[in-house]
């Protein structure tokens, strides 16, 4: 198992992000484990603390339903009063590729309404070919094209009037890739340059503005097992932070250190595992917090998570998540 948070940047042309104080499926169990154990549904109960004691009542905060392949098909988030705050539905093809995502939100005085929609298609090689979407205000379309060798060629975003809003043009030269981003079309707004090693690991990513000024740069190094052992982040040409990663004999990440430009070294996160590779303890540092946040996991004999005792140091908030399963 390899766990790394706050790691690689992802390409986002149209996304929305929500931060919740809860556990995602990927943090609890892999799709393969859900499929193997034939889990059909998981209900997350939230139990707050009353002084130093866990409130035994609790309330349901998330219900996640799965298909027979272990894919999430529905996630319902609940408010403390039991009403629905949001609903997310997913559809997949026979290769477990996501083909539709719908997000419904509870808007005050409006009730539950569609807030976000994505529909995906794929080409004969399994590459994403198109995305049709609704971002809460208007519709959009994203078209993806590829070179004969399968490498990305272009990504083009169209607005509701079918006008080009944004274009990403890829140039590949050996292990190097250059991405020219035009937004609006005709105006070069950013250039991203990536360098990879022979194993396909990202070594260097540099972002510059259209007029050539360096915006940000990230540099990685790897061990013999192709696991990252360091990451250095630069902004406007200056080193802002470095991270080093430590693994155990099973290639499981056990520690992440933050090294500041003044060479101050801080334990940024740590992980402990049981004999089957299941994570049982996680600690991480929040900026300006006086203590580490943590999660302690209780598992059953099959490695399925029963309970997570969680403390968020930046909020000084402790909570226990308990899980009920339907098979």
Where are these regions (language model features)?
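Buried hydrophobic residues that stabilize the cores of well-folded domains
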Residues: 23-327
């Amino acid at each position: 198992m390899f766990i790394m948070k706050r790691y690689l940047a992802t390409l986002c042309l149209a996304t929305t992000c929500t931060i919740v104080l809860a556990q995602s499926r990927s943090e609890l169990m892999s799709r393969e484990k859900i499929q193997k154990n034939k889990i059909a549904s998981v209900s997350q109960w939230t139990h707050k603390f009353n002084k130093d004691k866990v409130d035994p009542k609790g309330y349901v905060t998330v219900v996640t339903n799965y298909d027979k392949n272990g894919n999430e098909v529905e996630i319902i988030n609940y408010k403390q009063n039991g009403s629905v705050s949001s609903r997310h539905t997913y559809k997949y093809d026979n290769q477990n590729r996501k083909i539709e995502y719908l997000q419904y939100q509870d808007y005050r005085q409006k009730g539950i309404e569609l807030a976000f929609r994505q529909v995906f298609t794929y080409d004969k090689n399994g590459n994403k070919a198109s995305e049709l979407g609704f971002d809460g205000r208007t519709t959009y379309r994203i078209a993806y094209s590829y070179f004969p060798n399968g490498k990305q060629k272009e990504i083009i975003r169209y607005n509701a009037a079918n006008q080009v809003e944004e274009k990403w043009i890829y140039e590949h030269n050996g292990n190097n890739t250059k991405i020219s981003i035009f937004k609006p079309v005709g105006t070069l707004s950013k250039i991203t340059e990536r360098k990879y090693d022979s194993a396909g690991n990202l070594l260097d990513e540099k972002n510059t503005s259209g007029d050539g000024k360096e915006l940000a740069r990230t540099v990685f190094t790897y061990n013999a097992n192709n696991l990252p052992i360091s990451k250095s982040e630069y902004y406007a040409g200056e080193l802002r932070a470095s991270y080093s990663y430590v693994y155990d004999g099973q290639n499981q990440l056990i520690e992440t250190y933050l090294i500041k430009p003044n060479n101050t070294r801080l334990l940024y996160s740590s992980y402990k595992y049981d004999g089957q590779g299941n994570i049982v303890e996680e600690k991480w540092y929040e900026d300006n917090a006086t203590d580490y946040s943590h999660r302690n996991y209780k598992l059953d004999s099959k490695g399925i998570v029963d309970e997570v005792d969680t403390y968020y140091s930046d909020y000084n908030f402790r909570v226990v998540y308990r899980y009920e399963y339907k098979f």
